[in-house]
């Protein structure tokens, strides 16, 4: 749990990940970035979207915020988007102000039912906890698609308004990484009811590796921010930064041709340190022999996750419009 600076200045530091967070010897975690938590709303005044929080699992603790846009009629069926928030596996939340504001807009503009997953964060819960939570939550949501295997804590919005023939997953940055690995797992394992993913939305995906790609600088690569983040959130990762979870082309990584979806949309931003890695990922998927369609949308002059921080700009509106066109 994060503590205020005033109560931690005298504590002994165990380790830290500047400028994101610090861990103290007593186990206290102090986070320096990330937006404040906000409650769900029966009706957002800007978009008319209704939100509520649900419990998916009590052990481990996995929950979600569900977004339901204004309905044309009480029996309307909507596409479903299971969304994994970003934050370097150690920051942010499905209940944060930034993601609440952003997903209200996405749900409204795309007319989609969004299930935003609250997975466990590092360092309290080092990876692969977030991947395990993401997969558990995905199976829980898809179990609503069949009458025989509905969970005991089934959600009425999903049952009444979810169209499981239009079922998508996606996320931003580390959340896009979780979505990618979930899509690979879907290609190898069956979801409840044999459900298939209609597409994957990958916004500024967090991938990395021991060798620079494209125009990534060679000098300083070993001390790059993504490498420091990965070593912090998954210190025991087999293969380190070339673990297949973070490097999809690492030795032993699953073949990208096995991605369990028919289409993918990848976003990159010109001023983002992850730009080249996102383009590299797009090219790798396209050349893998995968039978699906992958599209790349580039926003030159924009920063990492600009659409979340500044959803009012023209480029953000364009990006959200592309999402709406993708989620059909």
Swiss-Prot record:
Alphabetical list of Gene3D superfamilies matching this protein: alpha/beta hydrolase
Motif Involved in the stabilization of the negatively charged intermediate by the formation of the oxyanion hole positions after renumbering to this chain: 85-87
Highest taxon of source: Eukaryota
Catalytic activity: (2R,3S)-2,4',7-trihydroxyisoflavanone = daidzein + H2O + H(+); 2-hydroxy-2,3-dihydrogenistein = genistein + H2O + H(+); a carboxylic ester + H2O = an alcohol + a carboxylate + H(+)
The enzyme's E.C. designation: 3.1.1.1, 4.2.1.105
UniProt cross-references to InterPro entries, sorted A to Z: AB_hydrolase_3, AB_hydrolase_fold, Carboxylest/Gibb_receptor
Residue ranges that the Swiss-Prot or TrEMBL entry lists as coiled coil: none
UniProt cross-references to SUPFAM superfamilies, sorted A to Z: alpha/beta-Hydrolases (SSF53474)
GO biological processes: flavonoid biosynthetic process; isoflavonoid biosynthetic process; isoflavonoid metabolic process
Active site as annotated: 173, 272, 304
Pathway listed: Secondary metabolite biosynthesis; flavonoid biosynthesis
Keywords: Flavonoid biosynthesis, Hydrolase, Lyase
UniProt GO MF annotations: 2-hydroxyisoflavanone dehydratase activity; carboxylesterase activity
Entry-linked PANTHER family: 2-HYDROXYISOFLAVANONE DEHYDRATASE (PTHR23024:SF449), ARYLACETAMIDE DEACETYLASE (PTHR23024)
Family: Belongs to the 'GDXG' lipolytic enzyme family.
Function: Dehydratase that mediates the biosynthesis of isoflavonoids. Can better use 2,7-dihydroxy-4'-methoxyisoflavanone as substrate. Has also a slight carboxylesterase activity toward p-nitrophenyl butyrate.
Protein name: 2-hydroxyisoflavanone dehydratase
Lineage, uppermost ranks: Eukaryota, Viridiplantae, Streptophyta, Embryophyta, Tracheophyta
Gene coding for it: HIDM
């Amino acid at each position: 749990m994060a503590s205020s600076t005033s109560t931690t200045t005298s504590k002994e530091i165990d380790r830290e990940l500047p400028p994101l967070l610090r861990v103290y010897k007593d186990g206290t975690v102090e986070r320096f970035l990330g937006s404040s938590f906000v409650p769900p709303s029966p009706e957002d005044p800007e978009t008319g979207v209704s939100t509520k929080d649900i419990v998916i699992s009590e052990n481990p603790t996995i929950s979600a915020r569900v977004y339901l846009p204004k309905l044309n009629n009480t029996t309307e069926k909507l596409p479903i988007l299971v969304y994994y928030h970003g934050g370097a596996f150690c920051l942010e939340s499905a209940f944060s102000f930034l993601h609440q504001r952003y997903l209200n807009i996405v749900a409204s503009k795309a007319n989609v039912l969004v299930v935003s997953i609250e997975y466990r964060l590092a360092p309290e819960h080092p990876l692969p906890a977030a991947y395990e939570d993401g997969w558990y939550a995905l199976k829980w949501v898809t179990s609503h698609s069949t009458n025989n295997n509905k969970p005991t804590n089934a959600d009425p919005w999903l049952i009444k308004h979810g169209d499981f023939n239009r079922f998508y997953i996606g996320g931003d940055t580390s959340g896009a990484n979780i979505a990618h690995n979930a899509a690979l797992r879907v290609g190898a394992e069956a979801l409840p009811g044999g459900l298939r993913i209609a597409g994957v939305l990958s916004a500024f995906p967090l991938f990395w590796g021991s060798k620079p790609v494209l125009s990534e600088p060679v000098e300083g690569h070993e001390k790059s921010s993504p490498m420091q983040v990965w070593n912090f959130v998954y210190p025991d990762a087999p293969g380190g930064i070339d673990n297949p979870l973070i490097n999809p082309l690492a030795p032993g990584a699953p073949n990208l041709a096995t991605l369990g979806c028919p289409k993918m949309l990848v976003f990159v931003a010109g001023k983002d340190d992850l730009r080249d890695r996102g383009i590299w990922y797009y090219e790798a998927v396209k050349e893998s022999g995968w039978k699906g369609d992958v599209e790349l949308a580039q926003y030159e002059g924009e920063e990492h996750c600009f659409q979340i921080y500044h959803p009012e700009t023209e480029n953000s509106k364009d990006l959200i419009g592309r999402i709406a066109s993708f989620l059909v």
